[in-house]
Amino acid sequence: MNISRISRLALALAFGVTLSACSSTPPDQQPSEQVAPGTASRPILSAAEAKNFTRAHYFSAMDPNAAPWTPSSINLPKQPDFVVGPAGAQGVTHTSIQAAVDAAITKHSASRQYIAILPGEYEGTVYVPAAPGSITLYGLGEKAVDVKIGLAIDSEIDSTTWRHLVNPAGKYMPGKPAWYMFDNCQRKRAATIGVMCSAVFWSQNNGLQLQNLTIQNTLGDSVDAGNHQAVALRSDGDKVQINNVNILGRQNTFFVTNSGVQNTLQNNRLTRTLVTNSYIEGDVDMVSGRGAVVFDNTDFRVVNSRTQQEGYVFAPATQSNLFYGFLAVNSRFTAAGDGVAQLGRSLDVDSATNGQVVIRDSVINEGFNMAKPWADAAISKRPFSGNTGTVDDKDNVQRNLNDANFNRMWEYNNRGVGSTVV
């Protein structure tokens, strides 16, 4: 027997099995092929640079002497302070979420107030005002979809139409905690209500916690492909936690701002938000605004049923003097269509804006544009330009990650067909 021939055959068979196993491994399970510095259209961080973009960095305070925010898991009490559900159901204290929020705020307690919500569909807006104490709202269903909060609101409707839609039967009245929020919007004299007043769920509460809920702007595909900002969830508070929540809509689905009680963006306030184990769906600028937001183990899905054109996941309006905007880690990006959607664009609300976002250690599917994953800026139309820097003789990338001459949209260690650098 020819031993060497048998050995060669065994080796060939083993090598073939290895190649077959590798080729059958799904792209999202293969190691990342992203290498720094990337390209001007798709800049990639080095391992050393990526160390600057972690939860701890994003949750640092504006005051350099203040400790960073270190959120722990949401802990729920055995007995909530309020229960929302059908009249007559056991333990129910309120039949509407807004009534429970009003009751929690009027307690004037510095202690966190817990509002449990029984499974069901709750049509209408929810406004959570600024207050000394924080609010936790959570669904009692087995899944997030068991509790649905929703309404169809379009930024393009006039204030009169909006007022009748949002405030049936005097839901918001003078003397009630959230009146100032409603009143600020109803007094608008513009032709349309605008994005700032288009949210179904709007909170200005510091320390807000949301868990096991579905929040949706149901405007959906009932409008054309034009500008129809329709916010499902808007948050203006600091130290906000969102866990196991479905946030559904189309344009500007999830809107984060640093606005105060006057409902205008501020230049001296930082809001921080942690989103975990959640699902966000939309088409144009589905996650937008000004604030430091970390998304961990979250699914982002871009749909094209309304626009039939390019969609954008992120639209950060980060101030140029702040280093951190949006961070997505251990997450999944899925888009309908073939290579049409884009990961994001800067929302240039003024000349002092340069949106910042990092997507790292995540999976991006084939629905995203590999040649141009980042789009030109909204409003200003500033062309996207990534900073590739220079490479020294030790193969270290040298560049200023906050250079105002470039965009601040980065990736690191992503996988999947859509993560390919071309």
Enumerate the language-model features and the residues they cover.
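Bacterial N-terminal signal peptides that target proteins for export
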Residues: N2-A10
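Intrinsically disordered, low-complexity serine/proline/glycine/threonine-rich regulatory regions
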Residues: A12-A14
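C-terminal motif of bacterial Sec signal peptides marking the signal peptidase cleavage site
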Residues: T18-A21
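Bacterial signal peptide processing site
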Residues: S23-T25
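Sequence-level preference for short, compositionally simple segments enriched
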Residues: Q30-V422
